[in-house]
Amino acid sequence: MDGFCDQQVPFMVPGKSRSEDCRGRPLIDRKRKFVDTDLAHDSEELFQDLSQLQEAWLAEAQVPDDEQFVPDFQSDNLVLHAPPPTKIKRELHSPSSELSSCSHEQALGAKYGEKCLYNYCAYDRKPPSGFKPLTPPATPLSPTHQNSLFPPPQATLPTSGLTPGAGPVQGVGPAPTPHSLPEPGSQQQTFAVPRPPHQPLQMPKMMPESQYPSEQRFQRQLSEPSHPFPPQSGVPGDSRPSYHRQMSEPIVPAAPPPLQGFKQEYHDPLYEHGVPGMPGPPAHGFQSPMGIKQEPRDYCADSEVPNCQSSYMRGGYFSSSHEGFPYEKDPRLYFDDTCVVPERLEGKVKQEPTMYREGPPYQRRGSLQLWQFLVTLLDDPANAHFIAWTGRGMEFKLIEPEEVARRWGIQKNRPAMNYDKLSRSLRYYYEKGIMQKVAGERYVYKFVCDPDALFSMAFPDNQRPFLKAESECPLNEEDTLPLTHFEDNPAYLLDMDRCSSLPYTEGFAY
């Protein structure tokens, strides 16, 4: 069993012996060692190049200030590829220390030359080729700087501000004044606050930050590379935001004015005319939309029929149309549509009591059914001379069938109604199971439904439908005008002087 290789399957290759397999092992082992050697050699060369690059970056970080120029990509690689810090010292919490995120980079210690490289490369804009930017180590001394292995090459900024590389930049503004060392009394609170190098060059000290909304917006875009900075979880109580958040905070006071302007856009003059508490144009400037809203009104037919007992307001109502709205009236006025159709050509219209208008909507013209009309006639003892109950259950007899037909014609505005037409309508109720014709007796009919159900359906809400009164004289079928002729005929356009103040005339055929 010792001679078998760990990957050999004996029954799959029966021709090979144990000795041959053992002799083939040294060749495989030599190949494996050769491959491993090549892999180790390649990886060593690869990582050797990376280590050389990293050493070059570290060497560049230790160059004196006047010769140092660190591009953006080098600062990114320095922070991302550098080993984690071994010792982290928590700084004192002061209001001025929250303005910068250099405390993240100061915790990296002496290995990086105390260069805050990442922050200033992301914050600073690209200078011209002839100028060299002011370097970030020109900050006040801090205990972290004093305890480091590599102290800053220059202790004060006024000496570094006089370097030849920074000479052309000094002509722009008073650079050394804001970067001078703080007084001894305030050094304990402001020692960890590095300042951006170009801030005194672009923002004078006497001008407020609110006057630079576009500059702050531009600085927020330049400081967006702060996102890849890895959060240091080892720092206790480190809840300070990143640097680009601090630089973009002056945008916040400038945000409410456009928001207020956006809310003010809703106060359109077209909307302000009806609001009682808002200033706006006078009401006469909005007459055209008011006229459109008045269009579906229904009182044009009532003004054309003078003898109809309409319950609409008339007279002085139309003269004050600018002060009131016509649709703010009683909703029961919209139940009437019975007095629109006249019955004579000469302008005589049927007289109609106003109680019919006060009823529920089922009493409108056309809604009263024939069986309901018959029950109403039977319920009134005054009609016993032409229709009455027979006394046998729900049977009733049309004593004068032509009179019943004539009254039904008055109710339905059909003066030519007769018993033949009425009897054909009654056959419809045979099929529906509402009434039947009593066999062997003429003009005798019978309701087949329950009496209580019959009267409850015929008189909803315990109110009897009001039937139309007798007309003055009999009319023929051809004497009745259709509704369309009535609307288009100018002979019926009466009381036009009362409607002159309205945007639309009453003669318009809707």
UniProtKB/Swiss-Prot annotation:
<feature type="compositionally biased region" description="Low complexity">
    <location>
        <begin position="163"/>
        <end position="174"/>
    </location>
</feature>
<dbReference type="GO" id="GO:0007626">
    <property type="term" value="P:locomotory behavior"/>
</dbReference>
<dbReference type="InterPro" id="IPR036388">
    <property type="entry name" value="WH-like_DNA-bd_sf"/>
</dbReference>
<feature type="DNA-binding region" description="ETS">
    <location>
        <begin position="368"/>
        <end position="448"/>
    </location>
</feature>
<keyword id="KW-0832">Ubl conjugation</keyword>
<dbReference type="GO" id="GO:0005634">
    <property type="term" value="C:nucleus"/>
</dbReference>
<keyword id="KW-0238">DNA-binding</keyword>
<dbReference type="GO" id="GO:0007274">
    <property type="term" value="P:neuromuscular synaptic transmission"/>
</dbReference>
<comment type="subunit">
    <text>Interacts (via C-terminal) with ZMYM5 (via N-terminal 120 amino acid region).</text>
</comment>
<comment type="function">
    <text>Binds to DNA sequences containing the consensus nucleotide core sequence 5'-GGAA.-3'.</text>
</comment>
<dbReference type="GO" id="GO:0045666">
    <property type="term" value="P:positive regulation of neuron differentiation"/>
</dbReference>
<feature type="modified residue" description="Phosphoserine">
    <location>
        <position position="248"/>
    </location>
</feature>
<dbReference type="GO" id="GO:0001228">
    <property type="term" value="F:DNA-binding transcription activator activity, RNA polymerase II-specific"/>
</dbReference>
<feature type="cross-link" description="Glycyl lysine isopeptide (Lys-Gly) (interchain with G-Cter in SUMO2)">
    <location>
        <position position="350"/>
    </location>
</feature>
<keyword id="KW-0539">Nucleus</keyword>
<keyword id="KW-0597">Phosphoprotein</keyword>
<dbReference type="InterPro" id="IPR000418">
    <property type="entry name" value="Ets_dom"/>
</dbReference>
<feature type="compositionally biased region" description="Polar residues">
    <location>
        <begin position="211"/>
        <end position="224"/>
    </location>
</feature>
<dbReference type="GO" id="GO:0050807">
    <property type="term" value="P:regulation of synapse organization"/>
</dbReference>
<dbReference type="GO" id="GO:0048133">
    <property type="term" value="P:male germ-line stem cell asymmetric division"/>
</dbReference>
<dbReference type="GO" id="GO:0060762">
    <property type="term" value="P:regulation of branching involved in mammary gland duct morphogenesis"/>
</dbReference>
<dbReference type="GO" id="GO:0000122">
    <property type="term" value="P:negative regulation of transcription by RNA polymerase II"/>
</dbReference>
<dbReference type="GO" id="GO:0000976">
    <property type="term" value="F:transcription cis-regulatory region binding"/>
</dbReference>
<dbReference type="GO" id="GO:0045202">
    <property type="term" value="C:synapse"/>
</dbReference>
<dbReference type="GO" id="GO:0000977">
    <property type="term" value="F:RNA polymerase II transcription regulatory region sequence-specific DNA binding"/>
</dbReference>
<feature type="region of interest" description="Disordered">
    <location>
        <begin position="132"/>
        <end position="245"/>
    </location>
</feature>
<keyword id="KW-1017">Isopeptide bond</keyword>
<dbReference type="GO" id="GO:0005886">
    <property type="term" value="C:plasma membrane"/>
</dbReference>
<comment type="similarity">
    <text>Belongs to the ETS family.</text>
</comment>
<dbReference type="InterPro" id="IPR006715">
    <property type="entry name" value="ETS_PEA3_N"/>
</dbReference>
<dbReference type="GO" id="GO:0034599">
    <property type="term" value="P:cellular response to oxidative stress"/>
</dbReference>
<dbReference type="InterPro" id="IPR036390">
    <property type="entry name" value="WH_DNA-bd_sf"/>
</dbReference>
<dbReference type="GO" id="GO:0005654">
    <property type="term" value="C:nucleoplasm"/>
</dbReference>
<dbReference type="GO" id="GO:0003700">
    <property type="term" value="F:DNA-binding transcription factor activity"/>
</dbReference>
<dbReference type="GO" id="GO:0045893">
    <property type="term" value="P:positive regulation of DNA-templated transcription"/>
</dbReference>
<dbReference type="InterPro" id="IPR046328">
    <property type="entry name" value="ETS_fam"/>
</dbReference>
<dbReference type="GO" id="GO:0060252">
    <property type="term" value="P:positive regulation of glial cell proliferation"/>
</dbReference>
<dbReference type="GO" id="GO:0071340">
    <property type="term" value="P:skeletal muscle acetylcholine-gated channel clustering"/>
</dbReference>
<protein>
    <recommendedName>
        <fullName>ETS translocation variant 5</fullName>
    </recommendedName>
</protein>
<dbReference type="Pfam" id="PF00178">
    <property type="entry name" value="Ets"/>
</dbReference>
<dbReference type="Pfam" id="PF04621">
    <property type="entry name" value="ETS_PEA3_N"/>
</dbReference>
